[in-house]
Amino acid sequence: LGYIWGFNPLSTDMVFKVTGRECAGAAIACTLGRAPTVANMRLVNDRMNVFAGQFNYPVGDLMNIPINTTMRGEVAFLPNKPYNISMFPGAYGLRASANPKYPDGVVEKNTLRYALGFDRTTLIPFLHPDDPWRAFSLSFQLFQNIIFDHEDGIHPFSSASKINRVSSLLTFRIGTGYLGDTILPDVFLGYDPEGYWSANPAISYVPPGNEKIKISLVGAFYGGHNKFKALGLFAE
């Protein structure tokens, strides 16, 4: 368990804040209220309170079934976390525009984040004919972000894609080694239930007797309809 008071290291948690407003027109037009108002904004990273904890627990049997899996987890509670908020749909045919309820474009909400992971090694002999005792490493993770007292229109500073009350991300990874662990194949899969997926197959070469050198070839494949969510941003 722990407590952090400081700046959030995640750039995606930054928000745009209004620092001032001014009239964008001639003095007479501003006086008559016939000139548009321009809002000056700044991207800020405020100090935050974070209550966090983690655990790591090996599980040998589940209901008398040997699973030999390590279960691990992390949890963080962020009170009064700032979010940008807009009105959807926006005025004048825009996808989003300023929310009259929040003229500064920022709202604070208590937020819970957690991750739950399962790791294990398993033998797949037919994929290792040269060394049937060389194991495969398997890892599955679930990430969730929950916004309490959620309001419609909350979105990240970087896009006009709304953040739901509960956001989820699933990942799976499998890897092993061949020829004395000089050839290391690896596959990473990610799935966002809101509309995106990614697949990253990779193969690495580690010269014998020199573990400090590693040469990797990584593929990147993306799909789905929502390119503004977490996985979709990498496709752009």
What is each PLM-predicted segment?
Residues 37-42, 97-107, 156-161, 187-189, ...:
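Extracellular loop and loop/strand-boundary signature of outer-membrane beta-barrel proteins
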Residues 5-9, 77-81, 122, 142-148, ...:
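Transmembrane beta-strands of outer-membrane beta-barrel pores
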Residues 1, 12, 69-73, 116, ...:
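Transmembrane beta-strands of outer-membrane beta-barrel proteins
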Residues 47-51, 108-114, 164-170, 195-199, ...:
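Residues that define the transmembrane beta-barrel architecture of outer-membrane proteins
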Residues 1, 53-57, 73, 116-120, ...:
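Residues on the lipid-exposed face of transmembrane beta-strands in outer-membrane beta-barrel proteins
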Residues 59-69, 123-136, 177-185, 208-214:
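Short loop/turn motifs that connect adjacent beta-strands in outer-membrane beta-barrel proteins
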Residues 16-24, 87-94, 154-162, 204, ...:
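Flexible, surface-exposed loop regions and adjacent strand-edge segments
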Residues 1-100:
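Long, internal scaffold/assembly segments composed of regular secondary structure
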